[in-house]
Amino acid sequence: MGHSKQIRILLLNEMEKLEKTLFRLEQGYELQFRLGPTLQGKAVTVYTNYPFPGETFNREKFRSLDWENPTEREDDSDKYCKLNLQQSGSFQYYFLQGNEKSGGGYIVVDPILRVGADNHVLPLDCVTLQTFLAKCLGPFDEWESRLRVAKESGYNMIHFTPLQTLGLSRSCYSLANQLELNPDFSRPNRKYTWNDVGQLVEKLKKEWNVICITDVVYNHTAANSKWIQEHPECAYNLVNSPHLKPAWVLDRALWRFSCDVAEGKYKEKGIPALIENDHHMNSIRKIIWEDIFPKLKLWEFFQVDVNKAVEQFRRLLTQENRRVTKSDPNQHLTIIQDPEYRRFGCTVDMNIALTTFIPHDKGPAAIEECCNWFHKRMEELNSEKHRLINYHQEQAVNCLLGNVFYERLAGHGPKLGPVTRKHPLVTRYFTFPFEEIDFSMEESMIHLPNKACFLMAHNGWVMGDDPLRNFAEPGSEVYLRRELICWGDSVKLRYGNKPEDCPYLWAHMKKYTEITATYFQGVRLDNCHSTPLHVAEYMLDAARNLQPNLYVVAELFTGSEDLDNVFVTRLGISSLIREAMSAYNSHEEGRLVYRYGGEPVGSFVQPCLRPLMPAIAHALFMDITHDNECPIVHRSAYDALPSTTIVSMACCASGSTRGYDELVPHQISVVSEERFYTKWNPEALPSNTGEVNFQSGIIAARCAISKLHQELGAKGFIQVYVDQVDEDIVAVTRHSPSIHQSVVAVSRTAFRNPKTSFYSKEVPQMCIPGKIEEVVLEARTIERNTKPYRKDENSINGTPDITVEIREHIQLNESKIVKQAGVATKGPNEYIQEIEFENLSPGSVIIFRVSLDPHAQVAVGILRNHLTQFSPHFKSGSLAVDNADPILKIPFASLASRLTLAELNQILYRCESEEKEDGGGCYDIPNWSALKYAGLQGLMSVLAEIRPKNDLGHPFCNNLRSGDWMIDYVSNRLISRSGTIAEVGKWLQAMFFYLKQIPRYLIPCYFDAILIGAYTTLLDTAWKQMSSFVQNGSTFVKHLSLGSVQLCGVGKFPSLPILSPALMDVPYRLNEITKEKEQCCVSLAAGLPHFSSGIFRCWGRDTFIALRGILLITGRYVEARNIILAFAGTLRHGLIPNLLGEGIYARYNCRDAVWWWLQCIQDYCKMVPNGLDILKCPVSRMYPTDDSAPLPAGTLDQPLFEVIQEAMQKHMQGIQFRERNAGPQIDRNMKDEGFNITAGVDEETGFVYGGNRFNCGTWMDKMGESDRARNRGIPATPRDGSAVEIVGLSKSAVRWLLELSKKNIFPYHEVTVKRHGKAIKVSYDEWNRKIQDNFEKLFHVSEDPSDLNEKHPNLVHKRGIYKDSYGASSPWCDYQLRPNFTIAMVVAPELFTTEKAWKALEIAEKKLLGPLGMKTLDPDDMVYCGIYDNALDNDNYNLAKGFNYHQGPEWLWPIGYFLRAKLYFSRLMGPETTAKTIVLVKNVLSRHYVHLERSPWKGLPELTNENAQYCPFSCETQAWSIATILETLYDL
């Protein structure tokens, strides 16, 4: 929690291409690239074009980033490479896996804008922009007086349309010379230059705190640009783009048709010059189809001259010794387009023709027949082209008529009037700078390069087109199909793919860009969606070179967020223009406010180190852009104020266009407007059309609203709530999460004119939570008594008879809009002000500043003060007081440091059944579910899901807001315990005392902040008490190690038998009932939730498979010792019980637990400092003889080494007994024979054996339970005989005891047994040798079919594996491929030949390795089934009642042994194999890491169904699963 630097983590995943994902970051952030699960362990290199500090950015120059591994260990799951972001723009990254590109994307870093003499930062969310049409500013020396209107209206950014020389059309966006300042700005006696502009821009920045940006137009130039005539190659002309010739021919024909219509030549045919109705439209369609198209014969440009082709074909057929180039048989005869687009200029591939049409002999008749077939095919191909062009012509007519309808008939169109040469029927698509001559002679020009190069295509836009496709390039038929909405004043520019393709154009536009970037701090990319991306990239790179913090804005009309993101990410667009005018009602306008910025009110505090999430582009939300229709016409003049207020309350940049605030009642045309803007004059009268001031339009209100917008952005009011009060009233709240102040703007929109539409007099009451400090602004749109609007000839004047009446910073009781305000309470700590309105007429706004009530404000301040110990984020708004609860004066970390790991188990974990033993339970959230744990982890698992998504509507948050139940549960549960646990509870209770005093909507956020602070501190406390392996380990290791805290605890009733009173440092406690001292040793739960409490908590086998990973590797040596000794006390018949049942209810029905116990003693001795001392520790024997009644602790103590010897002796002697209380009372499924337990050691082989076909004494212990399927009482996997892992474990034990006995540490060198009445000694040396000599001979299935050691060659179905058992009662079971041999490989690797072992491991990898676990049976086995369903009871013998528990489902714990075996033997195979194996291990383990992170139990399951599908019958977190994965990481 303690980070203050903002760090974002980007996880890299294999083949993940994120080019359409927007990642936005700020300068000063650190970006870390980390490997996702699919890349763990692989050799990955990250490249980026983000430059080294101090270097200039070069888009093409990539560098690799160095990996940093915080743990400096082989387990590098935490490794990362990083960028410290100090430069704005768009930067690319990609990564290679080996030498192959595996994924990549872009990051966009925001610019930092600075203004004022002191160069202070202007945050992007504070931007208030106003657009000016540059040509309406008049002579340059008058600009300041006109621009002052923006300053006085509170704007801090001015956007100028282009300042360059305009083309003939006088459109602001049709530039004749990109390098020259518009001469209109100069006086006859004074020529102004770019330097003058630069000085003004600098003055505005320094003195007015106003930033200036301007447009860059890269797509087109004015048709009369001098330079385009000198460099026609810069345009799409008929020389460099001959594919446009047919379109040009059509365009000329339509122009001539238009001229004839204008001259009345078609009046007789039903087309007058003034097009007025559908009849005229139909006549146009008829003339084009019947008259124009047939004459043009456009299809001829796409056809073959058939006679010519046939003659060529005939010549080739009759040629002597002609060579036919072999052609692809799949190629068919098609027309090859003539690249010069001449009529009948197309051809076909004669090679294909010659192999398609083959004469049957060389005679003239055969050749003639062939030519006829060829002729017929040519006619067919030409017909296909005719049909295609006809299809294009249909579209062309439809588009043309649509255009005519819009321009001349549509109500919303410009109604151009009669067809004239100035206003033709349709806009021309091409320039024609020559005198008009006869049409056929004009057409001949297209083939004369010196003429054709000046026939250039105009620019425009295509509705619904793919913006990433250039519509003027070959392959596009836009010009022919008349789909272009054309700008007849501009020529489209043709850049090609790189500067070398058109050097003059690239150099000219680069110079234009550099002039712009020299004088302006930002640019607006005009027509961005049609600008070739590579061109815009190149130009913006040049601009950023001069202006590193370039502010780039653009408007995109792609219609797709994904496509928008392509432009934003590639170009590094800072803000996308969004239009409020797109909203059709107030509800939609409010939705846009919520969409374009801010987070919900009461949001969770996000950590400084967190994943990098995809973003939506930062918005520049405009109430109107210069392209929009006039809102006064579209809506009403009364809506200007409320809509502006709504837009300004958005948590993003906001903007407007000059004329809106003055209420100009028409659109100010970028083409035809030639009047000048009004000037600022504080004294001007409303009747003065050339000057404005605060009395004009909504300027006074705009000033107040702009200042408020900037204040909210600067002071961190980043949370937003939008309330649709009724169909016209929208209330927008901006909230500061640090000082908990809100600003609430209530706007009554007027989308319909109040004079002509009905608005209700009744306005709903509003409830505003908190205390209203002031009315920031109240404003009403009113009429005043002045002359109505008349359009002025010289100035762009607004509506004089409508203005606003405003009052700022007044008290609530002074308001004229609020009738009365009452105070109500909602619950004990929620103050609400009920507002009743009386004058909130359409076109009015009222803005309140609201604080928490003083009581809640203090409570929040105190909470923030105590939370600063966890994060500096809470410093702002914190309040220190002296009278807080004394416990809060203790830093939480020092309180936590007193806790033991057993106490942390109670605070953090404990599932339902554990908690029930204490009379409690897990917290249940109504209408959702119960938490997984009663401790803090239960809450944190849910919060970790909902915090990053800010899911405040989750039932968890609803429960917190509805009442204090969960809050009290958390603290009371701990206070009811004793010692430091209760102290932690009291600390939480003291924090919750203040939490309960704040408004309910803030409770989820602060509850989370308190808990995450406490929780992370408690985790640190846990790790500090563990081994250095954990403390210095990766996040994965640390999170796995918490399994030790999760599964090891002390219940109300002790689970372990009582240890010898002679043993030192055993933990004790006072019994709550008897008040007597009792032992309270930690026991290890086998798994949660099923094996967690009562007699089913502790199992010998599970405990000792898990003990090394859960307790020894984590450094919990005393707990490990106590568990080893407690189980030692229960030894009986030479066996350790499986079900422990406190020793009294123990069942001695498993053959393997004793060997796992011995393995753990060996591990303890090797891993723990002075570990061998355990051998002398006293063991309190519960059953000194096999038939003793259970003795109280301390009655008979023995050193551990004697107990070990007894176990070895009993096995060599042979074990045979019947379980006590045999029958349904201890096992309702077992058949009678199953209760007979046998075990022993084979005299020949030294192998431990045991069991019968009615019991299952190994870990694969499923007993049939179904009467219906007739498998009740039959074990699914008896594994009788010598199970491979038991042989391996016994070999490990014997070898170890032999080593100790040689050093006289273990006092016994042999075991003594009675055979035929005689005492026989078997030395450990001999026993060890027997196993060594026989293991591979009898367990390995040779690849040689004639191997004499193979007793049942007919049962072999996989060679090169190790058997699962030897000597089973059903011999075929020996030959099943299961993962158990890998256990033997780890504990007794000396039994295996490296090459054979490696082969077997490769087979296991191919057949058994699953995503999380190992298949428990070969999928090729006939009884394999990978899905375990214990509830299913059917007739299927192999499945019913979960009979296939170990016949396929993927168990997790064996995967640890498989991976450890792979690691061990790979090191013997050589460095190359080792490297590959490490990659495999890391890759497999990464899936466990992902599961662990995502699991609400924060554990690894017992098993999964096949392919890692969830198994509902599995424990959610299992001790041995966690343990063996930790052991693998330890081995790594």
Curated annotation (Swiss-Prot):
Q: Name one Pfam family in it.
A: hGDE_central
Residues bearing Phosphoserine are 64
Q: Name the cystine pairs.
A: none
What does the record list as GO biological process? glycogen biosynthetic process; glycogen catabolic process; response to glucocorticoid; response to nutrient
- Protein's UniProt keywords contain Zinc: no
Give the principal location in a single coarse category: cytoplasm
- Keyword set, alphabetical order: Cytoplasm, Disease variant, Glycogen biosynthesis, Glycogen storage disease, Glycosidase, Glycosyltransferase, Hydrolase, Multifunctional enzyme, Phosphoprotein, Transferase, Ubl conjugation
What reaction does this catalyse?
Answer: Transfers a segment of a (1->4)-alpha-D-glucan to a new position in an acceptor, which may be glucose or a (1->4)-alpha-D-glucan; Hydrolysis of (1->6)-alpha-D-glucosidic branch linkages in glycogen phosphorylase limit dextrin
Asked whether the UniProt record includes Transferase among its keywords, one would answer yes
**Which ranges does the record mark as transmembrane?**
none
> Which GO terms fall under molecular function for this chain's record?
4-alpha-glucanotransferase activity; amylo-alpha-1,6-glucosidase activity; glycogen debranching enzyme activity; polysaccharide binding; polyubiquitin modification-dependent protein binding
| Compartmental location | Cytoplasm
State whether it acts alone or in a complex, and with which partners, per the record. Answer: Monomer. Interacts with NHLRC1/malin.
What name does UniProt use for this protein? Glycogen debranching enzyme
> Upper lineage ranks?
Eukaryota, Metazoa, Chordata, Craniata, Vertebrata
